[in-house]
Amino acid sequence: MSSENILKGDFHIHTYHSDDSDLRPEWIIKKAKELGLNIIGVVDHGSIKGGRETEALAKRIAKNLVVFAGEEIKTKEGEIIAFNISKDIPEWMDLEETCREVKRLGGFIVLPHPFDSFRRGLGVSARRIVSYVDAVEGFNARTMFDRFNRNAVKFSKENDLPVIAGSDAHFMEEIGMAVTFVKSRPDKESIMKAIKSGKAHIMGWKSGFKPHVKTFVQKRFR
């Protein structure tokens, strides 16, 4: 049995299955290996396809890389991330209905950029689903104002929820701009358990305005 080690992860990376990203699974894996990442969370808007493709490829070419495949789901109130689900979850449902469906599938719920009012953060609606939430994205590298991340950390502390960090990468240079360190064995079940137990710590660097411009261009001309 593998022993616990400090693992390094970026829990929020998009692929070309999102209309505002150009990242391919093989690029993501290559960059993760270059950065010494042990864990990546790969999500797309409304789809688990990119995460599934990345996970399957990693099993062939990067067996020591743990890939969490997931979906960033738009609800009527804002966005959530669901990891560890077996199928796409429909978008634009009520927030509680979406969370119930994620949990029915055995999913792990993360609140991405919850207080970023520019990017479908849940804001005060997050309070309604605390009982469903497994982790809060305490640092999102694409968040433009520091107070949005500070408010996410504050919310996590007030509600006794663990934090993770995600770059929200849509392009290569963004991968690894936010990092989660977690003491765990290198498998998904152990990592999820360790995060829930408060064994994760976060750090990150803001990626600035340029990625948002690239995202706009990508969506406009794709």
Show which residues each predicted segment covers.
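Residues at the C-terminal ends
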Residues: 34-36, 104, 158
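Divalent metal-dependent hydrolysis catalytic cores, especially in the metallo-beta-lactamase
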Residues: 28-47, 108-110
